[in-house]
């Protein structure tokens, strides 16, 4: 079966193929939101130990530390991803809980009122929170696995994706 063709183009490349930051000055200012998730998969024995300890490690509260790190990452996304616009973040919320016997689910929702979306901020927040969980737990095992990390929804731009949260 032949591959589908699309007229979509990469927005961060100019007509000469050089990398560029998208000019959003002509876009409408709208309420924007995005939700992303990342998951941390633990070996069974590590998950059992974490559950028994109330998600606390020798370094402190795992969930609390992941929320702080994820929030810091959301606010600094434009410093990490070259063509992300610096955005006035109006809200950032994390939900972190078990999604199965050995999997910790991290959901990050970001909101702002601006000309461009906050998908990268939500993805960065969820990713850094997951990396922080790994860091907090690596003394117990290096067999943890992070992923998938994915966009669950976005609202307020040209097209909405996923279910509203």
Swiss-Prot record:
The answer to whether the entry has keyword Lyase is yes
Query: What domain of life does the native source organism fall in?
Result: Bacteria
Query: Could you say which enzyme class this protein belongs to?
Result: lyase
**UniProt cross-references to SUPFAM superfamilies, sorted A to Z:** Molybdenum cofactor biosynthesis protein C, MoaC
What is catalysed by this protein? Answer: (8S)-3',8-cyclo-7,8-dihydroguanosine 5'-triphosphate = cyclic pyranopterin phosphate + diphosphate
Q: Which pathway does the database say it acts in?
A: Cofactor biosynthesis; molybdopterin biosynthesis
| Residue numbers binding substrate | 83-85, 120-121
- E.C. designation(s): 4.6.1.17
Q: Could you tell me which InterPro entries the record lists for this protein?
A: MoaC, MoaC_bact/euk, MoaC_sf, Mopterin_CF_biosynth-C_dom
Question: Which GO biological-process labels does this protein carry?
Answer: Mo-molybdopterin cofactor biosynthetic process
Which keywords has UniProt assigned to this entry?
Lyase, Molybdenum cofactor biosynthesis
- Report if keyword rRNA processing is assigned: no
Give GO terms: molecular function aspect only: cyclic pyranopterin monophosphate synthase activity
Active site at 135
Listed NCBIfam families: moaC, PRK09364.1
How does this protein assemble?
Homohexamer; trimer of dimers.
| Chain's role | Catalyzes the conversion of (8S)-3',8-cyclo-7,8-dihydroguanosine 5'-triphosphate to cyclic pyranopterin monophosphate (cPMP).
Q: Which family does it belong to?
A: Belongs to the MoaC family.
Write down what this protein is called: Cyclic pyranopterin monophosphate synthase
Q: Which organism is it from?
A: Xanthomonas campestris pv. campestris (strain B100)
What gene is this protein translated from? moaC
């Amino acid at each position: 079966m032949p591959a589908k063709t699309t007229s979509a183009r990469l927005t961060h490349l100019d007509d000469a193929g050089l990398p560029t930051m998208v000019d959003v000055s002509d876009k409408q200012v709208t309420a924007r939101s995005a939700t992303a998730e990342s998951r941390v998969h633990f070996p069974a024995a590590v998950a059992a130990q974490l559950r028994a300890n109330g998600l606390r490690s020798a370094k402190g509260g795992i969930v609390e530390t992941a929320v702080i790190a994820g929030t810091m990452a959301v606010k600094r996304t434009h410093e990490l991803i070259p063509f992300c616009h610096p955005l006035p973040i109006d809200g950032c919320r994390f939900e972190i809980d078990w999604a199965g016997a050995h999997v910790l689910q991290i959901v990050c929702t970001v909101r702002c009122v601006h000309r461009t979306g906050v998908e990268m901020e939500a993805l960065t927040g969820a990713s850094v929170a997951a990396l922080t969980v790994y860091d907090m737990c690596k003394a117990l095992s290096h067999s943890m696995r992070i992923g998938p990390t994915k966009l669950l929804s976005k609202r307020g731009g040209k097209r909405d994706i996923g279910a509203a949260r």
